[in-house]
Design a protein with these regions (language model features):
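Short conserved micro-motifs at the rims of enzyme active sites and ligand-binding pockets
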Residues: 123, 193, 203-205, 261-265
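Conserved catalytic cores of phosphodiester-cleaving nucleases, focusing on short active-site segments
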Residues: 153, 180-182, 188-196
Length: 360
């Protein structure tokens, strides 16, 4: 999402080091903390030979203990207010997502969950682009997210083809199809709406969703509405560019996984989608089919583990009440669908040019 020149320049100007510095140091630090809990002097050449970059990255991803306590308390108070004291949700906020390393007064560092360093350097890059002056970069990231999904599916399943959104409708009312149209043998089998917007923690876990999570719910509801609108256009014969399968699947793919296991929030999203759809008489009850929600991570994980038949099996079952909130890959596992991990289909050096420097 952010591996392009404008984002790279913004990141370096803001932080004093590059995105490549962050990803390389995060990988090296992850290995270090897995081998030893406390870090004083790095043992790995990747880190010890880049002391200046290491110091800058540690300064950005770490917090001293007093500051960590203060921010953690503020997060907890925010959560208590948002959930009205009902802290039952599994995915709670943590300072370790943005600052996965804690620093002692004597200068030693510890990463309580080393894997979060990798998360901070990948999906966690979002934290570096939340400023008002980065709005254009975020908009570009949203578009790049759509292109990523379009490239990801045929990269893992080469028998499929993905098309960009298309303008459809009548002369009086034109609108866009969902962001991604998936074709199998020139027939549309899946339509996908992509949502790159991230929610705040309080929005994700708020007890009063109408207040706390309205932004996130509205965004996802628009995605569901777009899918339903496409179903209606197909039924009415307005969309005729490609044949459409009778078993057409609708999906909303997010950058976050905060809908995972959360059937209550999911229900609120669908409820809001119905409210929006009620304004359009052409969208009939038959068009309002179940829509599958999944994160980009889960989409990639599922595609890496299965073939076309397995993917369609996962989508069919994910739309049922029984499997609402399940990871797509977990559905395949529960159904006993054979899984065999495929090689990563893209060139990693495009986003991690330092990869060749890692020890074999």
């Amino acid at each position: 999402m952010y591996a392009h020149e404008e984002a790279r320049k913004y990141f370096e100007a803001r932080n004093g080091f590059t995105i490549d510095d962050l990803t390389l140091m995060s990988v090296g630090l992850t290995f270090e903390f897995m081998l030893q809990p406390w870090l004083v002097a790095p043992k790995h050449d990747i880190l010890s030979s880049r002391k200046e970059a290491l110091a800058k990255v540690l300064g950005a991803v770490s917090l001293p203990i007093p500051a960590a306590r203060k921010i953690a308390l503020a997060l907890r108070n925010e959560m208590i207010a948002a959930t009205k004291g009902n802290l039952l949700t599994a995915h709670r906020p943590s300072i370790l997502r943005q600052h996965p390393v804690i620093q002692k007064a004597d200068g030693a560092y510890i990463a309580p969950i080393p894997e979060l360093l990798i998360q901070r350097a990948t999906s966690g890059l979002y934290y570096d682009f939340i400023g008002v002056d980065a709005q254009g970069i975020r908009q570009q990231a949203a578009r790049r997210f759509e292109l990523y999904v379009q490239e990801l599916i045929p990269a893992y399943l080469p028998g499929l083809q993905c098309l960009d959104e298309q303008e459809i409708g009548t002369k009086k009312r034109k609108f866009l199809s969902p962001d991604v149209l998936v074709l199998n043998d020139d027939t549309i089998t899946v339509v996908i709406e992509c949502k790159a917007t991230k929610n705040t923690f309080s929005a994700q876990f708020a007890a009063d969703l109408a207040v706390g999570a309205i932004r996130g719910i509205n965004e996802l509801a628009k995605g569901v509405f777009q899918v339903w609108r496409f179903y209606a256009a197909v039924r009415q014969g307005i969309y005729t560019e490609y044949p459409v399968a009778d078993t057409l699947h609708g999906m909303v793919v997010t950058m976050d996984d905060w809908l995972r296991l959360d059937t209550y929030v999911r229900a609120e999203v669908v409820k809001e989608a119905h409210r929006v759809a009620d304004k359009y008489s052409e969208i009939e009850p038959a068009d309002r089919r179940p829509v599958v929600f999944t994160s980009a991570h889960q989409l990639a994980e599922t595609l890496a583990l299965t073939d076309e038949q397995g993917w369609y099996t996962a989508l069919t079952n994910a739309a049922t009440e029984k499997y609402q909130g399940y990871d797509l890959s977990s559905i395949l596992e529960e159904l006993g669908v054979p899984a065999e991990r495929k090689a990563f289909p893209f060139n990693m050096e495009e986003v991690m040019p330092w990869q060749k420097e890692l020890p074999k």
